Amino acid sequence: MSLALRGELVVDKTKRKKRRELSEEQKQEIKDAFELFDTDKDQAIDYHELKVAMRALGFDVKKADVLKILKDYDREATGKITFEDFNEVVTDWILERDPHEEILKAFKLFDDDDSGKISLRNLRRVARELGENMSDEELRAMIEEFDKDGDGEINQEEFIAIMTGDI
């Protein structure tokens, strides 16, 4: 599967054995989210900016979570946190993510019709959303390459194998 999503989610088994660290891409995503949602460009983010930045990074944060982060990290009582604090919080949260759970979330992004499988239609939609200009022939070839049970679609088990490199 040549879509960008695969590259972001492939689980590196050697890293799981060592202390996990963020990739350069993940570090850049954190920086970009902070800069994008620091709307007043004061090098700190408030409650609303923090909540939106966390959501942009894939976290479904509750009001209580955001308030706790602000309480724990707002040392100057400004109602805001700095990039350094944001980076510390988000890095911890990212490293606590379960890679298997992230793969299942990605599968659900493809399987928007809840069929339990990724069809040609699902794959075509995702490719289009990612700006990939791929023909149906190319998309079918991708499915065929990983479709171990030969049903013309990618089921959850096959998707997990793709994403973990257990093909």
From Swiss-Prot:
The keyword DNA repair does not apply. CDD domains: EFh (cd00051). Plays a fundamental role in microtubule-organizing center structure and function. GO terms for molecular function: calcium ion binding; G-protein beta/gamma-subunit complex binding; microtubule binding. Signal peptide: none annotated. It comes from the Eukaryota. It comes from Mus musculus (Mouse). One of its GO terms (cellular component) is centrosome. The modification Phosphoserine is found at S135. Ca(2+) 2 binds at D147, D149, D151, E153, E158. Monomer. Component of the TREX-2 complex (transcription and export complex 2), composed of at least ENY2, GANP, PCID2, SEM1, and either centrin CETN2 or CETN3. Interacts with USP49. Belongs to the centrin family. GO terms for biological process: cell division; mRNA transport; protein transport. Ca(2+) 1 binds at D38, D40, D42, E49. InterPro entries: CALM/Myosin/TropC-like, EF-hand-dom_pair, EF_Hand_1_Ca_BS, EF_hand_dom. Keywords: Calcium, Cell cycle, Cell division, Cytoplasm, Cytoskeleton, Metal-binding, Mitosis, mRNA transport, Nuclear pore complex, Nucleus, Phosphoprotein, Protein transport, Repeat, Translocation, Transport. It is found in: Cytoplasm, Cytoskeleton, Microtubule organizing center, Centrosome; Nucleus, Nucleolus; Nucleus envelope; Nucleus, Nuclear pore complex. Pfam families: EF-hand_7. Residues 25-60, 61-96, 98-133, 134-167 form the EF-hand domain. This is Centrin-3.
